[in-house]
Amino acid sequence: MKTLEKKLAEDFKIVFSDKELLETAFTHTSYANEHRLLNISHNERLEFLGDAVLQLTISHYLFDKYPQKAEGDLSKMRSMIVREESLAGFSRNCHFDRYIKLGKGEEKSGGRQRDTILGDLFEAFLGALLLDAGLKAVEAFLNQVVIPKVENNNYERVTDYKTALQELLQVDGDVLIDYEVLKESGPAHAKCFEVAVSMNHEKLSSGTGKSKKLAEQEAAKNALEKLQRGS
């Protein structure tokens, strides 16, 4: 397997000046915690920075591409692009999952393919790239990796899964649809929420996300898929 540095250079023409910064971006908290005595840095702070630069870059792209769209529509489109599932997909497409350093427990539990970890990794890489090479380098990378996917997948057709679920379930009359936070974890700047959706107090499904709203949408999406399968 190619080294991470070689892959970045060959596939994206990216060469990090600060090698430690790149290594930190690919170090999960579980790995750092298992090697506390070595005082290894993990990628949560870089993830915080990467999230901000991703939001900025995608917002700028959408603002320019869709001059007639209202703020609400642009916000929905951006949410679909930067949601956890999408970012994890971008990480996999770049084969970043092969290079992240995980703790033994996280590795055994399937962390290398977990959307939460891979989405955070993608943001951490963007944060590291911003610090090492600047905003133009981040924009160039996103133009290679994210923008083509956005244009091919037609994110203009944004689906509000909560509304779609409500419309589906209320065909047969009034029903009570409720969303409940099951779990809240992670540090203040990188929260993860797990939310359950129920109909008339009977749980349909659950979902996770970096905010309650995103977790609710994911729960509604999973419920729709479950109902469509007839299970």
Swiss-Prot record:
Keywords: Cytoplasm, Endonuclease, Hydrolase, Magnesium, Metal-binding, mRNA processing, Nuclease, RNA-binding, rRNA processing, rRNA-binding, tRNA processing
Active site, per annotation: 51, 123
Needed co-factor(s): Mg(2+)
Pfam families attached to this UniProt entry: dsrm, Ribonucleas_3_3
Main location (coarse class): cytoplasm
Record-linked SUPFAM superfamilies: dsRNA-binding domain-like (SSF54768), RNase III domain-like (SSF69065)
Localization: Cytoplasm
Domain RNase III: 1-134
Catalytic reactions on record: Endonucleolytic cleavage to 5'-phosphomonoester
InterPro entries: dsRBD_dom, RNase_III, RNase_III_dom, RNase_III_sf
GO terms for cellular component: cytoplasm
UniProt superkingdom: Bacteria
Residues given in the record as Mg(2+) binding sites: 47, 120, 123
One GO MF term: double-stranded RNA binding
All copies of domain DRBM, residue ranges: 160-229
GO biological process: mRNA processing; regulation of gene expression; rRNA processing; tRNA processing
EC code(s) of this entry: 3.1.26.3
Cystine pairs: none
The family this protein is said to belong to: Belongs to the ribonuclease III family.
PANTHER family documented for this protein: RIBONUCLEASE 3, RIBONUCLEASE III
Described purpose of this protein according to its UniProt entry: Digests double-stranded RNA. Involved in the processing of primary rRNA transcript to yield the immediate precursors to the large and small rRNAs (23S and 16S). Also processes some mRNAs, and tRNAs when they are encoded in the rRNA operon. CRISPR (clustered regularly interspaced short palindromic repeat) is an adaptive immune system that provides protection against mobile genetic elements (viruses, transposable elements and conjugative plasmids). CRISPR clusters contain spacers, sequences complementary to antecedent mobile elements, and target invading nucleic acids. CRISPR clusters are transcribed and processed into CRISPR RNA (crRNA). In this organism endogenous ribonuclease 3 and Cas9 are required for correct coprocessing of pre-crRNA and the trans-encoded small RNA (tracrRNA).
Subunit-level organization: Homodimer.
Protein name: Ribonuclease 3
Organism: Streptococcus mutans serotype c (strain ATCC 700610 / UA159)
